[in-house]
Amino acid sequence: MKSYKQLSKKERAALYAELMESYNEYVKKGLLLDLSRGKPNGSQLDISNGLLSVDLTKSYSSRAGVDCRNYGLLDGLPEMKEFFANALNLDKNDIIVGGNSSLQLMYDTLSRALLFGVHGSVKPWAQDKGLKWICVAPGYDRHFKMTELFGFELLTVRMLPTGPDMDEVERLVRDPKVKGMWCVPKYSNPTGCTYSDETVRRLAAMECAAPDFRIMWDNAYAVHDFSEDKDELADIFTLAEEYGNKDRIFYFSSTSKVTYPGGGVAFMAASANNRKQITPYLGAQTIGYDKVNQLRHLRFFGTPENMYKHMLDLGKVIKVKFDIALSKLDELSGLDIAEWTDPKGGYFISVDVMKGTAKRVYDLTSGAGVTLTPVGATFPYGIDPDDSNLRLAPTYPSDVELALACEILVLAIKLAALEKLGI
């Protein structure tokens, strides 16, 4: 079919009536379908069930003989640090192993910065007024909510196919009130974008007016490739060291979507200066995280290579989901009413519909029993200035449910576009 913009008003009205008839048939079915959150379903979690049968009863000690059932080792098992370092090309000495949640580590990191400052701070951040934070959008709603909760003014920077609009980022960091920015550098939520080498280099090299500016580098999807045909991400620490800016980076990741979202292992990585400043406060907060779970993961995987194989098995299953969603979205090709991403990994598809129609699409899909991520969630303050972005999370529904939900979504996008163009 030709572009909707090329249809006459009479043609649009006839098409709208036909599509609305189909829509009403879906409404009558009383469906309950969910495309709103990026989480694995039961069959994907089953791939990690070997984790539950790891027998620790014969040996619950670390390599150095530490009883993992007891207190101690504030920053985690040395072999867990080595595992993450080898898997993600990090320095093992930079790593602090946490509990199951990298988001909690991020929250704690910002809390400490507000209460005590960071290395290079003149005073605790909370003693300064009018602090600002760069948020790349579309982006991760929980990141935005966290910095909003802490009282930062959120500054929106556009996400481009190569990553953040670096011209805008470099302009904003000239303001000493701008203390940091969020980055999901590989298979970014929700666009699936991986930052280009140039973008990573510019982030590492840029001059910041605030001497204690920090990049929260949330590498959540570091190994979440669908196949061997994957995106490669430049090494932020190597580049930051090259420009003398290693202190700038707070790096986070976890096994949340590698094994179990509620039972994985999270970590942060930071420079020696940052770790020296962090550790005393961390020691006041906890005597140590769950070493039994660290040991369980180490014995389940054994080597990073085994984890990569595990992730390729998981990636094959998830790619089927993405292929189903993308095949349905292809029905919109040539209509000039929507664009969408086709990532090589991660958990999300980003759909941009006609400006001013995303909320209407949301209402239509909701009316037919399909739950989407609320419109605006991918932007600071929950406001999409163009009312155009939708985030799809294909991983959780069954294949049949996913196909049905995407059919309804496509129908809603068509109806909303026709309403916008005039019928």
Residue ranges: model-predicted function:
Residues 219:
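Walker B catalytic acidic pair
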Residues 98, 238-319, 330, 418:
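Conserved core segment of the aminotransferase class I/II
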Residues 312-326, 337-352, 366:
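Conserved glycine-rich beta-strand-loop-beta hairpin in the small C-terminal domain of fold type I
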Residues 60, 66-211, 222-244, 358, ...:
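Conserved core of the PLP fold type I
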Residues 361-367, 406-410:
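Short amphipathic alpha-helices in soluble, non-transmembrane regions
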Residues 2-75, 79-86, 367-370:
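N-terminal "arm"/small-domain region of PLP-dependent enzymes with the aminotransferase-like
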Residues 350-355, 372-414:
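Conserved PLP-binding active-site segment of the aspartate aminotransferase-like
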